[in-house]
Regions:
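Solvent-exposed, amphipathic alpha-helical segments
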Residues: 19-31, 73-80, 166, 170-178
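Amphipathic alpha-helical packing segments from all-alpha helical-bundle domains
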Residues: 106-116, 126-153, 161-169
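Amphipathic alpha-helical interaction segments
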Residues: 19, 40, 61, 128, ...
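Hydrophobic alpha-helical connector segments
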Residues: 79-119
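Basic, helix-initiating cap at the start of DNA-binding domains
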Residues: 1-31
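Helix-turn-helix
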Residues: 27-65, 69
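Hydrophobic/aromatic-rich alpha-helical bundle segments in the mid-to-C-terminal region
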Residues: 148-198, 204-213
Length: 213
């Protein structure tokens, strides 16, 4: 009996949290995140402020959960998870036209597919959140990507972190300028950036190998 009651309570918690997150995303179709209020989200979700605070401390906490969800969805659909970051870039170079790269969208890095699901795209289209999301993505991906760049390019952790931040921020800004819509222009830009990133990594690796690092 206790297990049954706990199960019902768990479902109720999930339902309420989903209602809050859906309400926030719905409101962001009309206004930026910084202009939202807890009262407004509660009204849209048809819950009380007390109910909101029983699940979240702030709207920032709701936002973090949504970004995590978007990242997990994108990561789950990846077909190149077993590859290191440099390996993936080299692998993608074989798809040398917009049409072919589009067919292999699932091979792109997670950060390039994080806004593929329409439900979450509004988060990334909000320019007031750009710095916040870029920093969060950097922290999420740093533990796996930075060591791979260090090993491949024969550089220090600090150098690899700066390089990854540069690549992530640049790609994010290009995506934002295209409103995160994956049309022909997006894939053409992605293809060009992919070539620049790969050539850069290869040049640094070659220089350091030649110098005996």
């Amino acid at each position: 009996m206790a297990k049954l009651r706990a199960g019902r309570e768990d479902r109720r918690v999930i339902y309420t949290k989903n209602a809050i997150k859906d309400a926030l995303l719905e409101l962001m179709q009309e206004k930026s995140f910084e202009k939202l209020s807890i009262s407004g989200v509660c009204e849209a979700a048809q819950i009380t402020r007390t109910t909101f605070y029983s699940h979240y401390d702030s709207l920032d906490q709701v936002l973090d959960e949504l970004i995590n969800e978007a990242f997990e969805v994108a990561e789950y659909s990846s077909t190149t998870l077993s590859m290191s970051f440099p390996q993936r870039l080299n692998y993608l170079l074989q798809f040398d036209t917009v049409e072919v790269l589009r067919e292999h969208n699932s091979d792109l890095p997670t950060c390039q597919r994080i806004a593929d699901m329409p439900k979450y795209r509004v988060l990334f289209q909000d320019r007031t959140l750009s710095e916040y999301i870029k920093n969060k993505l950097f922290r999420m991906m740093k533990p796996s990507v930075v060591p791979e760049i260090m090993e491949y390019c024969r550089i220090s952790q600090a150098e690899a972190e700066r390089m990854f931040r540069y690549m992530l921020s640049g790609s994010y800004e290009v995506n934002s300028s295209l409103n995160w819509i994956k049309n022909d222009e997006w894939f053409a830009s992605r293809l060009a950036i992919l070539r620049v990133e790969t050539a850069g990594l290869e040049a640094i690796r070659a220089a350091n190998l030649n110098s005996g690092k």
